[in-house]
């Protein structure tokens, strides 16, 4: 029970949430006075777990303390060394913890033709991943955007396979604009986390792409891009991309939510991009505080500090802070 934040309908009301068999079966509004708030869980919309130097299971143990309940992970770093077996390891390891990991099929293994790599993943192997691993929701970031623009048959074959299986395609196109960007986006590339200016982000939004606003350990575009969120919140998500362990222990997506509020972003809009949009975009099995949804939510102390009191995934308390 608590003050329930209905992000989708932009309202806050006191109420009780009833959970059974991992799902919310009933939400009852009442007139009680509560000190705490209940919100949907946070989602990292683009993450390379390898940068944390942790396994998925170990990463999850820290992330849930900050209210993260799910992440969309591109395992192309381990795949560049171990190929398909590396991806399978990440997926299998992620199954060991109560956390909602989703993965992409890496499109850039090797990343460039000049790279000394340990593996190659072609379109046929991408298709095998889509067929055999339901955790894989998307074709991983298409980093070689020049290959797309120049209609390289190998990268286009991977994109075609993704569309064949109804999978989204993530992007990676820093600084790309004009006709080249239009051609890149025309292949159904749906996101980009590599924008450095608001102008660049808005051009991509106008072409139908979603912008993943990033603040990680390696690159930080959050402060530059977050002002677009009040108007374009429906087309934004939050991500860390790369998160080193010393930064992860300090905070995760929760820190970006607080930073967004301080920057003047409306409460419901910052929660929309932190909690709701990744679920809708990637079709994730993550609850959004609605009846019949999975019981994935956070109990927090207030709407300023966002201190996480409990993190709940599939109706189970996976972390609790005094």
Summary of predicted features, one role per range:
Residues 55, 84-87, 151, 178-185, ...:
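Histidine/acidic-residue-rich catalytic or RNA/ligand-binding cores of hydrolases
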Residues 141-199, 215-219:
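Divalent metal-binding pocket/active-site signature
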Residues 228-306, 312:
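His/Asp/Glu-enriched, well-ordered alpha-helical/loop segment
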Residues 41-49, 71-73, 101-105, 138-141, ...:
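Hydrophobic faces of well-ordered beta-strands that scaffold small-molecule active sites
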